[in-house]
């Protein structure tokens, strides 16, 4: 059984935001939506992210000790990591705010559209010679994407 048979009652997202430190664990969940909800909240909490071989599209953009605190995959260093954060409250607060800013920039609606824009533009450059459009095709004209990207994308 989990935690040696000890199971705590479920906690709502709103209740989670009362905690100073929030641990993101790999498993059967939706980590990207959880990041967006938790990090994008008005009450900053420091994210503690498990080192893992699993990933989301935005993980390469995140930097340890800038946007989150990294914890070993077996959580062997969790106590030491929390002690470090408690001993450095200014740094912990900065990491929490950096994580929140990261969400607003990359995981917001505009941020996700920019990510898709960059993917589609790369695909377009690769497939440009093979691309054909007929009267039955439904697409967003490239000029609209470029106008959007110019104003919104990083």
Residue map of PLM features:
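Catalytic donor nucleotide-activated moiety binding site of glycosyltransferases and closely related
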Residues: 1-9
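Catalytic binding pocket for nucleotide-activated donors in carbohydrate/polymer assembly enzymes
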Residues: 10-154
């Amino acid at each position: 059984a989990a935690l040696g048979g000890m199971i705590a009652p479920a906690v709502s997202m709103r209740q989670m935001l009362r905690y100073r430190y929030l641990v993101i664990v790999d498993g059967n969940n939706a980590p990207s939506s959880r990041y967006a909800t938790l990090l994008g909240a008005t009450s900053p909490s420091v994210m503690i992210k498990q080192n893992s071989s699993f990933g989301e599209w935005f993980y390469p953009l995140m930097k340890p000790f800038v946007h989150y605190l990294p914890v070993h995959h077996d959580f062997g260093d969790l106590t030491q990591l929390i002690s470090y954060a408690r001993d450095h409250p200014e740094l912990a607060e900065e990491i929490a705010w950096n994580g929140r800013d990261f969400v607003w920039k990359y995981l917001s609606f505009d941020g996700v559209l920019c990510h898709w824009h960059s993917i589609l533009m790369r695909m377009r450059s690769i497939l440009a010679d093979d691309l054909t459009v007929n009267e039955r095709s439904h697409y967003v004209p490239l000029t609209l994407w470029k106008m959007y990207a110019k104003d919104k994308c990083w």
